[in-house]
Amino acid sequence: AVLNGNALAIMVALVPAALVNQLLGAMTLNGVVTSLAMMVTLAQSALPLIAAFTVGTMLKLGMMETASMALATLAGSGVTTFKDGTFTLAGSGVILNVMLTTAVAGLVAMGATKVLGQLRVVFEPLIVLVVAGGIGLMTLPGMVAVQAAVGQVVASATAAAPLVMG
C-alpha cells in the first residue's frame, strides 16, 4: 500500500508539471502562462499531502488518520523550510523521505486508533505529527544524502551511456 500509494501520488503531483512545463517554456509570458506555471508548481509541492492521502486510502484508514498522516508527511518531507520566522514551500520534497514518513505515519495512526479510543479525536493528530513527522525530520538529512548519491550515479550512467553504446 505504501509503495502503490506513493507511486500514484508521484503520478498525480509530478506528471502535470512534466507535461506542461515543456509547453510553457515555448510560450510568451502572460497571465495565463504564469497561472498555469503556478498551478503545476503548487501541484508538485503538494506531493507529500497527496502521498499521505493515497497511502491512507489504500490502508483503508479513516479521514482523521489520513489527515494526520498528511500533517506528518508534510512536516517530514523536506518540502518546507523555516527561516527567519517564515515558511517557504519549494519543490516536491525528498521522495525517499516522503515514502518513509508515510509508512511510519500509517503505522503510528493505526496504533493510535487502537490505543486512544475516544480520545483519539483530541490526541491522534498530535501524536502522528510529532512521532512520524519527527522521525521524518530526523531522517531527512540522511535521505537527502542518499537521494543525491543516487542522482550522481544516474548522472554518471547517463553520461557514460554514449561511450558504452559507441
Summary of predicted features, one role per range:
Residues A1-G166:
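Signature of multi-pass transmembrane helix bundles
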